[in-house]
Structure formats: structure tokens, C-alpha cells
From Swiss-Prot:
Its main location: cytoplasm. Residues 1-48 are annotated as: Disordered. It comes from Lachancea thermotolerans (strain ATCC 56472 / CBS 6340 / NRRL Y-8284) (Yeast). Cotranslationally removes the N-terminal methionine from nascent proteins. The N-terminal methionine is often cleaved when the second residue in the primary sequence is small and uncharged (Met-Ala-, Cys, Gly, Pro, Ser, Thr, or Val). The keyword Transit peptide does not apply. Gene3D superfamilies: Creatinase/methionine aminopeptidase superfamily, Winged helix-like DNA-binding domain superfamily/Winged helix DNA-binding domain. A divalent metal cation 2 binds at D203, H272, E305, E401. A divalent metal cation 1 binds at D192, D203, E401. The gene is MAP2. HAMAP family: MetAP_2_euk. It is found in: Cytoplasm. Binds 2 divalent metal cations per subunit. Has a high-affinity and a low affinity metal-binding site. The true nature of the physiological cofactor is under debate. The enzyme is active with cobalt, zinc, manganese or divalent iron ions. Most likely, methionine aminopeptidases function as mononuclear Fe(2+)-metalloproteases under physiological conditions, and the catalytically relevant metal-binding site has been assigned to the histidine-containing high-affinity site. This is Methionine aminopeptidase 2. Its EC number is 3.4.11.18. GO terms for molecular function: initiator methionyl aminopeptidase activity; metal ion binding; metalloaminopeptidase activity.
């Protein structure tokens, strides 16, 4: 989920959310086994099988696969004194559960996106797409129709609303209830998925394009993200990562309808560090050189994401809002005066806390006629809204993103999979 530099937005309204195999019939070759057509057994249909189940059943020891390990290329990250080693071993023991939670979330993320990739095709509605993602996430984490974890709704599950931004829309779009937008063959769709376990969020995204004419655009952004992952490390300045990303992305061109476009970084979109139950932890990882001398630190958890565009390379907010999150400053603000806003805030606190949410999630919880109250919470700074972020109409944008963990000796690309 992107960290946008542009912060203003517009509010409008809308609401409400919404195989089997047949085996061959085998008969004996013996004449005695012959039966009349009227006595033939009916073919029995197998019950539907569902490979999506609570992932804890697949890993009964609760030890989840590690991500891709990468060396730091900065020498100072490779040299540690004995005292530092001892301190790390103490911290490492304390951090094991955190790392394991991240790895659990990442394994669920890989399985969720594979499930979607097997089903994705043109002419699906975007609502169908996000339901496939989010229902699978709930089942893998054990938060499903059976009501598991209802007493602890924030313990694990969806990390933020599934982004399915199309074409010139780069980020922060998920369908509201009643949205009938259809994914077409000629579309470029960014799929941004979040999974959280005990508040530790795995944030990873890729771009879907059925038409091969967009291949260079996708390749540019994929390579730019991989460059950002390679450059990231302890004590690395954020501006240096942005400079490396920019150089790679701008080296690509894409030809569309007879016109050649240089792929441009969306310069006001960034990666970010991630804090417990908070998708944007305070540091932004630029995708262009911006002079930010802030450094990455040991133990931090970053989403390295890049966005490339055939347009201006600059996004502005616009369109119907779907993404929201409780503000970091909310607890220090006066309580809402509207009784409906108070009850809605209670629902938000109990089910999301500071995790991002969308209108569909409120619908799913049985909330109705809440839009005025929600806008009131936004107006008073208690809730932050995140409108869709768009480049110019007619342009195409792509995104790739990985979550990394900065260990003392190496970094772990926890969300890496066979797909990207």
C-alpha cells in the first residue's frame, strides 16, 4: 500500500457488499457384470474440494518458511564485534515471534495471490477479484465464516483493503458496494494485498496485464523494485535508494499505439517502513533522488515499492474514496459529538484499530447508513481518508512491491515468491 506525498482528498457516497469434478464410471469387462441401461448406476459427483484452509493446519509446529535472504553490499553491515553479536543474540531471541509472524503472513500472501492468479481473467468484476483475495486471506488466517477469532478480530487477517487500481489510477482504489467495474483485456491492474498477523503487516503488490504490449512497462517497474530491494540496508540513506530506483526505471521505454514513452517514476509515491498495526510507520522510501538523508536502521521492516507511468509521473487525488484508517493522533482529539459517529468509531476501534479499512468491511460488519458519520470522523481528524491517486487520463501505471526485514547481517525479502 503506497505512501503518498499528496494528502488532500474528496468524499462522495455509495454502499453494500455483497468446483466439482465428476469421475469416470468404470464397469467390469465380465459379461456377468453387464446391466441394462435402466439399471446403470448414476454418476456420482464428488463434493467440492477446497484447498484453502487455516494455514496453522499445514504448519502444526508454527514454524513458517523464511523469505529470500540477501547479503548487504555495505562492508560496515558485515563486520560485527563480539559484544554486538552477544547483544543481537539477546534481541534475536526476543524477536523470533515477530519474525515468525511476518513469515506466516508472507506464506499466506503467496498462497492468496497464487489462488487469485489461477482464477484471474478478463471480464471479471473488480468486486469478484477483491472477494477472492480477502475471503482466501480470512480462511488462511482462520478468520472465516465459522467466526474464528471473533473475540480478537485484530489478531490476524486482512492487512488493508485489496488495491485493484486500473490504468492511470496508480493506488488506493478498491470497489465500494455496488461498483460494477469490469477488468478488461486491455487494462493494467495493480493488485496490492496486505496480510497481518498480530499486527505485523506483509505488504506486497504486482501488476496484471493480459496484453503483451505492456510487457516493457511491467519489466521496468519490476526491475526498479528489485533494485530498491538490493540497495536497501542498515545505515543506507533513503535518497540513495531512490536515486538507484530512478536510474533503472528511466532506462526503459514502452511503445503503445505507435508512440514511444519513457517509463517515469511516479515521483510523489513512495515505499515506507511498517509499524505494528500501522501500515505507514513514519519513514518514506522515495523512488527518485530527493535528498532525504534519513537512514534505514537495524530491525526495521520496510515495504519497498515502485510505480512507473507512461504519463507525467505525478499523481493527484481524485474519485470516490474507499480507503480509510484511524489517525495516529486520534486518541488525543476530542471525542465525536454525533452519537452515530461515536458508535461507528467504536466499531472501527474494535475491528481495525489503526489498520486501514474500507467501506465494504463496514458493510460486512452490519454497519449501514454510516457515510455521514464516517465523513464527520474524517472532518474532525479522527479518521484519515485515502482517495484514489491518479496520473493523467489515458496513461498507464504499474507497481511492484516487496516487504523486507533488516536483520544485522543480512536482509530477508519475506514476501518473495516464485511469481515475483
Amino acid at each position: 500500500m503506497s505512501d503518498a506525498i499528496a494528502k488532500d482528498a474528496v468524499n462522495t457516497s455509495s454502499e453494500k457488499e455483497p468446483v466439482s469434478a465428476t469421475p469416470e464410471l468404470k464397469t467390469s469387462g465380465s459379461p456377468d457384470a453387464a446391466v441394462s441401461s435402466g439399471d446403470k448406476k448414476k454418476k456420482k459427483k464428488k463434493k467440492k474440494t477446497n484447498n484453502i484452509k487455516n494455514i496453522a493446519l499445514l504448519y502444526p509446529d508454527e514454524k513458517y518458511p523464511e523469505g529470500e535472504w540477501m547479503d548487504y553490499h555495505q562492508d560496515f553491515n558485515l563486520q560485527r564485534t563480539t559484544d554486538e553479536e552477544k547483544r543481537y543474540l539477546t534481541r534475536d531471541a526476543e524477536n523470533q515471534q515477530r519474525w515468525n509472524d511476518m513469515r506466516k503472513g508472507a506464506e499466506i500472501h503467496r498462497r492468496v495471490r497464487k489462488n487469485l492468479q489461477n482464477k484471474l481473467k478478463p471480464d471479471m468484476t473488480l468486486t469478484e477479484v477483491v472477494n477472492i483475495v480477502e475471503n482466501a486471506t480470512r480462511k488462511f488466517t482462520g478468520v472465516d465464516e465459522n467466526g474464528d477469532h471473533v473475540d480478537r478480530p485484530k489478531s490476524q487477517g486482512v492487512g488493508f483493503p485489496t488495491g485493484v487500481s486500473l490504468n492511470h489510477c496508480a493506488a488506493h482504489f478498491t470497489p465500494n458496494a455496488g461498483d460494477q467495474t469490469v477488468l478488461r483485456y486491455e487494462d493494467v491492474m495493480k493488485v496490492d494485498i496486505g496480510v497481518q498477523v498480530n499486527g505485523y503487516i506483509v505488504d506486497s503488490a504486482w501488476t496484471v496485464a493480459f496484453d503483451p504490449k505492456y510487457d516493457n512497462l511491467l519489466q521496468a517497474v519490476r526491475e526498479a523494485t528489485n533494485t530498491g530491494v538490493r540497495e536497501a540496508g542498515i545505515d543506507v540513506r533513503l535518497t540513495d535508494i531512490g536515486e538507484a530506483i530512478q536510474e533503472v526505471m528511466e532506462s526503459y521505454e514502452v511503445e503503445l499505439n505507435g508512440k514511444t514513452h519513457q517509463v517515469k517514476p511516479c515521483r510523489n509515491l513512495c515505499g515506507h517502513n511498517i509499524a505494528p498495526y500501522r501500515i505507514h510507520g513514519g519513514k518514506s522510501v522515495p523512488i527518485v533522488k530527493n535528498g532525504d538523508q534519513t537512514k534505514m536502521e537495524e530491525g526495521e521492516h520496510f515495504a519497498i515499492e515502485t510505480f512507473g507511468s507512461t504519463g507525467r509521473g505525478f499523481v493527484v487525488p481524485g474519485g470516490e474514496v474507499s480507503h480509510y484508517a484511524k489517525s495516529a493522533e486520534a486518541d488525543g482529539l476530542p471525542a465525536p459529538s454525533l452519537s452515530r459517529a461515536k458508535s461507528l468509531l467504536k466499531t472501527i476501534d474494535e475491528n481495525f484499530g489503526t489498520l486501514p479499512f474500507c467501506r465494504r468491511y463496514l458493510d460486512r460488519l452490519g454497519e449501514d447508513k454510516y457515510l455521514f458519520a464516517l465523513n464527520s470522523l474524517v472532518k474532525h481528524g479522527i479518521v484519515q481518508d485515502y482517495p484514489p491517486l491518479n496520473d493523467v487520463q489515458g496513461s498507464y501505471t504499474a507497481q511492484f512491491e516487496h516487504t523486507i526485514l533488516l536483520h544485522p547481517h543480512r536482509k530477508e525479502v519475506v514476501s518473495r515468491g516464485e511469481d515475483y
